[in-house]
Design a protein with these regions (language model features):
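Core RNA-modification/binding signature centered on pseudouridine synthases
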Residues: 16, 113-233
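Ordered, amphipathic secondary-structure segments that act as subunit-interaction surfaces
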Residues: 32-91
C-alpha cells in the first residue's frame, strides 16, 4: 500500500494480499538476498507500472525500495510467467557459506571429505520416535574458499569459509544437522551460515531463480512481479 501497488487479494471472508516469499530462511541464518512473489490485480499490466523499459524498471525498484524498511532494497524486478509455480516449489538447491572464528581452513577441508562418503546416516525424531535417514544424497558439492575482502572484514577468524550446495528436495538437510556432520567436536549452534544462491532446474540446467542481469534486460509482461530484495545480515 505504501508503494502504491495494486496487489491482488485472495478470495474468502478475509481477503489477504497475494504476497509470498520464496524458500524460508532458517532461524539464525543470514542471506545475501531473498525473493518475493507479488501478484498484481488482473487489470494491471507491467506496462502500467513502467516495467517495459529499463528506465521504468529502475524507477520502479527505487520507488519500491523507498517504501521498505531501512536495510531492505529491491535490486531487480522481473515478470513471473503466467501459470508458474511458487518460488518455494521451484528452488531445488541452495548454496551456503559456513564459518566461525574458531574454524580454520583445515577444518573446512576436512569437512569436504564428506563428499567421499557413500552414506551419511543421521538420527531424526518424528512424532516422538527415532528414525534414521541417509542424507548423503542431499550434499551436492563442498569446497573451501576465502571470503571476499568486503565480507571477510566483518568476520573474525582467518577469512576462510566452507561453500556447500545442499538439496532442498524432499525433507532437506537442516543446517544444524549439516554442521554436526561437517564439524564434529565443534558446537553446531556456533557455526554461522549465509545463503548466497537459490537454484532451480530447467531445460538448460541449473540457473538462479531470478537472474539479475537477464531480468534487467527482459521486457516484463502481465501476471506478477518477482523482486529480489536484499536482506540485512
Amino acid at each position: 500500500r505504501r508503494a502504491g501497488l495494486l496487489v491482488a487479494l485472495s478470495e474468502g471472508f478475509t481477503p489477504r494480499p497475494k504476497i509470498s516469499f520464496g524458500l524460508a530462511l532458517p532461524t539464525g541464518a543470514e542471506s545475501v538476498a531473498e525473493y518475493v512473489d507479488i501478484d498484481l490485480r488482473p487489470d494491471i499490466s507491467a506496462a502500467d507500472l513502467g516495467l517495459d523499459s529499463l528506465a521504468g524498471r529502475r524507477a520502479f525498484t527505487e520507488g519500491l525500495s523507498a517504501a521498505l524498511p531501512i536495510g531492505f532494497d529491491v535490486v531487480v524486478v522481473a515478470e513471473r510467467p503466467a501459470g508458474a509455480g511458487s518460488l518455494q516449489d521451484s528452488v531445488t538447491t541452495c548454496t551456503w557459506e559456513f564459518w566461525h572464528p574458531r574454524l580454520t581452513t583445515e577444518d573446512h577441508r576436512r569437512a569436504c571429505q564428506l563428499m567421499a562418503a557413500d552414506t551419511l546416516v543421521i538420527e531424526r525424531e518424528r512424532k516422538g520416535k527415532l528414525s534414521t535417514d541417509d542424507v548423503r544424497p542431499l550434499i551436492l558439492d563442498l569446497f573451501t574458499k576465502f571470503a571476499g575482502s568486503d565480507i571477510a572484514a566483518g568476520r573474525e577468524g582467518d577469512g576462510s569459509v566452507l561453500v556447500a550446495d545442499l538439496s532442498t528436495v524432499g525433507r532437506g538437510l537442516r543446517l544444524s544437522e549439516f554442521a554436526e556432520l561437517a564439524y564434529p567436536g565443534h558446537d553446531a549452534r556456533d557455526v554461522r551460515a549465509m545463503r548466497t544462491h537459490q537454484w532451480t532446474e530447467g531445460p538448460d540446467g541449473r540457473r538462479e531463480v531470478l537472474d539479475a542481469p537477464d531480468a534487467d534486460l527482459a521486457v516484463a509482461g502481465p501476471a506478477g512481479i518477482a523482486p529480489l530484495a536484499e536482506a540485512p545480515a
